[in-house]
Structures are given as C-alpha cells and as structure tokens.
Amino acid sequence: AAQFDADIIILADLARWEAQQRQRRHEIANLGADNHTAQAGELYKRSYFVDWRVCDRWKQDLLPVLDYLLDTNEPGVPRLISGDTLLDALQHTSARPFRVVPFFDPGLWGGHWMEEICGLDRDAPNHAWCFDCVPEENSLLLGFGDQTVEIPSNDLVLLEPVALLGDAVHARFGPEFPIRFDLLDTMGGGNLSLQVHPVTEYIQAHFGLHYTQDESYYILDAETDIFKQGNLLGSGLASALTLENLPEFGHSVA
C-alpha cells in the first residue's frame, strides 16, 4: 500500500496481555497520549475501544506487505522473522487445529477452583477468569526450529479471516472472531457481577462496534449441595423489569 512505501517495513508486535501487564506497571501509555500514570483500567478501556481498533485497521494493510516482524514481548530479547515466514506460518495455522495462549487474572468474584484444576499460583489472591480462545486479547506461539515467536492471535484473524471463520461468518462479522471463551471461577469466591450489554444500534452509534454481546453459560463444576444452599443462577433481565418488580425477577432460575 502507498502509505507503507519504504525500503524496509518492520512491524514491532506486542501481545495484548503483555501490553496490559506493562500498563499495570505504568510503563506504557495509550496511542498518541502521555498518560502512562493513569489508572490501569482506564488505559485498558482506551486500548480496547480505540487503540487496538485503530492499529488493527493499519495492520490489515501492513501485515501482507511487511518485510519483517519483530517480537517485542520479552524485554531485551527481540526475535525477528521475515514477513513471508509469518504469512506462511499463519496460512498453515488457519488450516489445522490450534490453540491460543491462555491467561488468568484475579477479580472481585474470584475463586480457587482453577488453582486446583490448572495448577496455578496459589500465592495469588484468587483467579476470577481465564481468557482462552479470545483472539483479540490472547496471543499465538509460532515455532521456528528452536525459537518461538509470540504474536497477538488477532493477527491470524486479520490475515486469514475466511480460512479461519468461513464465508458465512466472515460475511456477517468481517475480520473479527465473534466469540469469546472465558472460564469464570467463583468457587470459594463471591457472586458474579451483573452485566448489562447494549442493543446493536446503541453499541454501533456510541462505541463503533457492529454487534452486541449475547452470553451462554455452561456449569463445569459445582459444590454438590449448591442448590440446597439456596444458591441460584439468575436467568438475566427481562424487558418488563422495573425497580418495583426487581425482587420478583431476582428469584428466577435458569
């Protein structure tokens, strides 16, 4: 593309989980800003709704024509591969089963089930969720001989959307992976948060997103007497909900 007219094009890439860790340590700022001292949550929100989307639009044109990709995830240990090598690796990945690199994070409702099942650090206060198969936030490890290169897994979505998603899904959502897979752990922790997602028209007008979030839950494990203790799984809110009848809806069970 004309905007990338240069003798050599090198993309310095960074996994988004690593970017979040650097934001939490106040080492990096948002795109075009001098705000590295801001709250980590504010840095993340701006990254999610602005920075990543702006950069992904550039990446769509940049990835097919770059000469080299530079993995910058490990400070002081940069790893360089050619653009052709990257394209071949992602084309190969899109045609076979693969998985992304999961990450785990504490939270308000966090429990300790994943510590037992996944062998996680028991010194952490809790583990509220595991992000696994969320390409816009997880990363992908590519092996080249005895070297491993880490890239945002969303690079694969941007470069091979049809091969990865299929024609019908790509026609509806474009180069975006429209499903997020999370593990939520409340065992030994607290109640999940109340989530409110806007309708499609609102989220498109105010956040620039083309679809809203619908959710489906699978219970993988539970205490044997969970329902005897009166613990219920709420089925969500209904259009007829008002402040007056909220207690009534609060007792619905999925």
Predicted regions and their residues:
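ATP-dependent NMP and nucleoside kinases share a basic, alpha-helical "lid"
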Residues: 1-32
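Short, flexible, glycine/charge-rich loop motifs used to bind or transfer phosphoryl groups or to couple energy/partner
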Residues: 2, 58-59, 207
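Small-molecule kinase domains that catalyze NTP-dependent phosphoryl transfer to phosphate-bearing small molecules
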Residues: 25-87
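Transition-metal
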Residues: 66-244
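Active-site neighborhood of divalent metal-dependent phosphoester bond hydrolases
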Residues: 247
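A glycine-rich, Thr/Ser-enriched phosphate-binding loop motif common to dinucleotide/cofactor-binding enzymes
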Residues: 250
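Loop-centered beta-sheet repeat module
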Residues: 253-254
